[in-house]
């Protein structure tokens, strides 16, 4: 059976970049563990804020955290009160000085991670998986995606035997390195078990053919 390589890992260093951007010598492991803790804590804390990705940079004893979200108002709060509280809570995890930047996602319907989380939430609310997949695909294509593929795997519809169902519209060239492929994964925790949702969104070519 053909296995799918992670589209972001496959393109690192060519058309994609890392979500953790810093260099370290001896304390590399400590900083990496800090990053993992910060990411896990933020994902839990901002579960309802439509967070797509968290990019961490560390310039000179600082930790600059860029949160990519579709709902910046929820994170910032009234007069920036919530973001200050967030900053103080993160200071308990890291020894560095914390700076938080909020990056707004203009088209959440075409962001692979947010689409995957949206489909997973619908599956948890017992919406029919085919309907939620179809709705997500239609929305992404309407907002300018050139192609999208959604995979749902698990006990779909409460079936005894787990299976994989997928739906695709447009083209999704996974082997073309210059193709801008956005990938997202989420889990739906249903009463029957966990359903995995994978989303690939093709947004066009980054480098045109010479």
Swiss-Prot record:
Q: Name one GO biological process term.
A: translation
KH type-2 domain residues are: 38-106
Matches recorded under InterPro entries = KH_dom, KH_dom-like_a/b, KH_dom_type_2, KH_sf_prok-type, Ribosomal_S3_C_sf, Ribosomal_uS3_bac-typ, Ribosomal_uS3_C, Ribosomal_uS3_CS
Recorded GO cellular component terms are:
cytosolic small ribosomal subunit
Question: One Pfam family for this entry, by name?
Answer: KH_2
Disulphide-bonded residues: none
**One MF term in GO for this entry?**
structural constituent of ribosome
CDD domains xref list: KH-II_30S_S3
Which keywords accompany this UniProt record? Ribonucleoprotein, Ribosomal protein, RNA-binding, rRNA-binding
- Quaternary structure annotation from Swiss-Prot or TrEMBL: Part of the 30S ribosomal subunit. Forms a tight complex with proteins S10 and S14.
Database matches in NCBIfam families? rpsC_bact
Sequence similarity = Belongs to the universal ribosomal protein uS3 family.
Query: According to its UniProt entry, what is the function of this protein?
Result: Binds the lower part of the 30S subunit head. Binds mRNA in the 70S ribosome, positioning it for translation.
- Which PANTHER family does the entry link to? 30S/40S RIBOSOMAL PROTEIN S3, SMALL RIBOSOMAL SUBUNIT PROTEIN US3C
This protein's name: Small ribosomal subunit protein uS3
State which gene encodes it. Answer: rpsC
């Amino acid at each position: 059976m053909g296995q799918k390589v992670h589209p972001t890992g496959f393109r690192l260093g060519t058309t994609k970049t890392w979500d953790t951007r810093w260099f370290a010598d001896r304390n590399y492991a400590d900083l990496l563990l800090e990053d993992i803790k910060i990411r896990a804590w933020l994902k839990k804390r901002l579960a309802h804020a439509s967070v797509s990705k968290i990019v961490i940079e560390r310039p000179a004893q600082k930790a600059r955290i860029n949160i990519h979200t579709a709902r910046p108002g929820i994170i910032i709060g009234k007069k920036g009160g919530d973001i200050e509280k967030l900053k103080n809570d993160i200071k308990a995890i890291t020894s560095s000085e914390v700076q938080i930047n909020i990056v707004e996602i203009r088209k959440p319907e075409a962001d692979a991670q947010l689409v995957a989380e949206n489909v997973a939430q619908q599956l948890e609310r017992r919406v029919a998986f085919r309907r939620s997949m179809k709705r997500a695909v239609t929305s992404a294509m309407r907002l300018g995606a050139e192609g999208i593929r959604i995979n749902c795997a698990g006990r779909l519809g409460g079936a005894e035997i787990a299976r994989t169902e997928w739906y695709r519209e447009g083209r999704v060239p996974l082997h073309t390195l210059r193709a801008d492929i956005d990938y997202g994964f989420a889990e739906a925790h249903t009463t029957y078990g966990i359903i995995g949702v994978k989303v690939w969104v093709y947004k066009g070519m980054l480098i045109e053919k010479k």
